[in-house]
From Swiss-Prot:
Catalyzes the interconversion between glucose-6-phosphate and alpha-glucose-1-phosphate. This is the first step in the biosynthesis of diglucosyl-diacylglycerol (Glc2-DAG), i.e. the predominant glycolipid found in the S.aureus membrane, which is also used as a membrane anchor for lipoteichoic acid (LTA). Its cofactor is Mg(2+). One of its GO terms (biological process) is purine ribonucleoside salvage. It comes from Staphylococcus aureus (strain NCTC 8325 / PS 47). The lineage of its organism: Bacteria, Bacillati, Bacillota, Bacilli, Bacillales. Binds 1 Mg(2+) ion per subunit. Its EC number is 5.4.2.2. This is Phosphoglucomutase. Pathway: Glycolipid metabolism; diglucosyl-diacylglycerol biosynthesis.
């Protein structure tokens, strides 16, 4: 009977394919991909919804977007009278169409919607929510995912992504909508009056905040190459740099045009060195010093440096975090009660740097919304000077409550320009940080373990560390095991336990005098990540051996 219902359901979807907006994507998919759309459901989680285009409740299409919008409309109307919302969207396939669908549904429920007439960055959305004092915000993006993906992120009135509790409540409203094919969305001219143009003054205010944060960029002969990887950071980043009287940059022209197919890159991800290939070519031709790339929605960025011999140094997220923290410490020396926030899987290097400079630090779960929650809870006397995640997400000043590559681009250029005046580079500065606080190094291993056996192995690895924690790993003596699922720390050296004041998450962190390793399974994919952050000789060899020991 269940198979018959699934077949009927599939037939109903195919009958509506012409109205779905995604017929072309569906027809390009394999039989397995098509079937997955009918055998699964999109779920609204803590980061919203992200998925492939296609037919069925497990795919993004006109009908599943209408379901999401209707659930959010009911959620917002249950939270407050006369709710307001701002919607932004990136350059991906169907981002504009999804934005209009959501705006129409929300307007149909007397929710005032601010909708721009062009694509915007994710940090601009966070800022706009705060600037316009709206009840919520929606960002339509799938970050650096492949071209056949899109997603919806929902933000609260503070400009941060919804908290875990708010996400769960919104998810219930969405699920209560039921079958997306049965939704009837009447559009009336009276209701479309709730859709308002997005005020240009908001963008101007955002730019002013960054200009005030930067002040000026000192004159040097620093040359920069910038690429948006076909995303949203052009034109806003070039306009911002020019407003700061910095014109010594070249754009990778082929990659600075919006392109939902990301035609010129294998991966539109600044973590991936291949994303810099065209930037490196241009840097070699123009003898540039600094290379910067942002991901498609401009919340994350990567940097590389070219020396006089044409050698390229790529910086990982933890190294960029250390450089930016170091610079912010220099910039804020007059402030008292300074605070840095980072995720629990980010480097020991930044914590050591904070301690050395008498800067308080706090660690939170992975996900920038947890950083935003920490910012919201700051005392009046505390000064947050920097926040970051090792996955290339950074925030210098909290007028935005999400990762913000747009404000970081001129900051890193200013830093590099100052160093250039003294004949130094970012690589030199990183080496100085190592000499000051020790050579803490970091790496990440990501394992995909498919199917039932893969899931079983992931569970077995996590269970082993919970029930039978090792006394030492590769000659490193284990001090403590932090289990964020049980909210407990087991101190092996004292044979005692203590509590972790944090939301629950399936993460285990093993602490040594030399640093830590962390294990973090994905909640949505058959993946598990191993983070290694240590100060020890032969780091690469030790990290490889730890990885082999755990996953052999």
């Amino acid at each position: 009977m269940k198979g018959c219902l699934a077949t009927m359901d599939k037939e109903l979807w195919i009958e509506r394919a012409n109205d779905s907006l995604v017929k072309h994507f569906y027809e390009q998919q394999s039989d397995i991909e098509q079937r997955e759309g009918f055998e699964s459901k999109l779920t609204f989680g803590t980061a919203g919804i992200r998925g492939k285009f296609g037919l069925g409740e497990g795919r993004l299409n006109k009908f599943t977007i209408e379901k999401l919008a209707l659930g959010l409309a009911r959620y917002l109307n249950a939270q407050t009278n006369s709710p307001t919302i701002v919607i932004h969207y990136d350059i991906r396939h169907l981002s504009t169409e999804f934005a209009q669908i959501i705006a129409n549904v929300l307007a149909n429920h007397q929710i005032t919607v601010y909708l721009p007439d062009t694509y915007k960055t994710t940090p601009e959305l966070s800022f706009a929510v705060r600037n316009l004092n709206t009840t919520a915000g929606i960002m339509i993006t799938a970050s650096h995912n492949p071209k056949d993906y899109n997603g919806i992120k929902v933000y609260g009135s503070d400009g941060a992504q919804l908290s875990t509790d708010a996400s769960e409540l919104a998810s219930r409203y969405i699920e209560e909508v039921g079958d997306p094919l049965q939704i009837d969305i009447p559009i009336s001219k009276q209701n479309t009056s709730y859709i308002k143009p997005f005020p240009k003054s908001v963008t101007d205010d955002y730019m002013k905040h960054i200009q005030n944060m930067i002040g000026y960029i000192p004159k040097s002969d620093l040359q920069v190459v910038f690429t948006s990887l076909h995303g949203t950071s052009v034109p806003i980043v070039p306009e911002l740099l020019q407003s700061l009287n910095f014109n010594q940059f070249n754009l990778v022209e082929a990659q600075c045009k919006p392109d939902p197919n990301f035609s010129s890159v294998q991966s539109a991800n600044p973590e991936d060195h291949r994303a810099f290939d065209q930037a490196v070519e241009l840097a070699n031709k123009s003898h540039a010093d600094l290379l910067i790339s942002t991901d498609p929605d401009a919340d994350r960025l990567g940097i590389a440096e070219r020396d006089a011999h044409g050698h390229i140094t790529y910086f990982n997220g933890n190294q960029i975090g250390a450089l930016l923290l170091n610079y912010r410490i220099q910039q804020t020396s007059q402030l008292r009660h300074r605070l840095m926030i980072q995720s629990i899987v980010s480097s020991e290097l930044t914590k050591s740097l904070a301690r050395y400079n008498n800067v308080e630090y706090k660690e939170v779960l992975t996900g920038f919304k947890f950083i935003a929650q920490e910012i919201r809870q700051l005392d009046d006397h505390q000064n947050m000077i920097f926040a970051f995640e090792e996955s290339y997400g950074f925030l210098s000043e909290p007028f935005v409550r999400d990762k913000d590559a747009v404000q970081i681009v001129p900051l890193i250029i200013k830093y590099a320009s100052e160093l250039k005046l003294y004949g130094k580079t970012l690589k030199d500065e990183l080496e100085q940080i190592y000499q000051t606080v020790g050579r803490h190094e970091d790496t990440l291993f990501s394992h995909t373990l498919e199917g039932f056996e893969g899931k079983k192995k992931i569970n077995a690895i996590m269970t082993k560390f919970r029930s039978n924690p090792p006394q030492e790993i590769q000659g490193l003596k284990v001090k403590a095991i932090e289990d964020y699922l049980t909210s407990e720390v087991y101190h092996l050296d004292k044979d005692t336990t203590s509590q972790i004041n944090s939301p629950k998450s399936n993460v285990i962190r093993v602490l040594f005098d030399e640093g830590f390793i962390a294990l973090r399974p994905s909640g949505t994919e058959p993946k598990i990540k191993l983070y290694v952050s240590l100060k020890c000789p032969n780091f690469d060899d030790v990290a490889q051996k730890i990885n082999a020991m755990i996953f052999s």
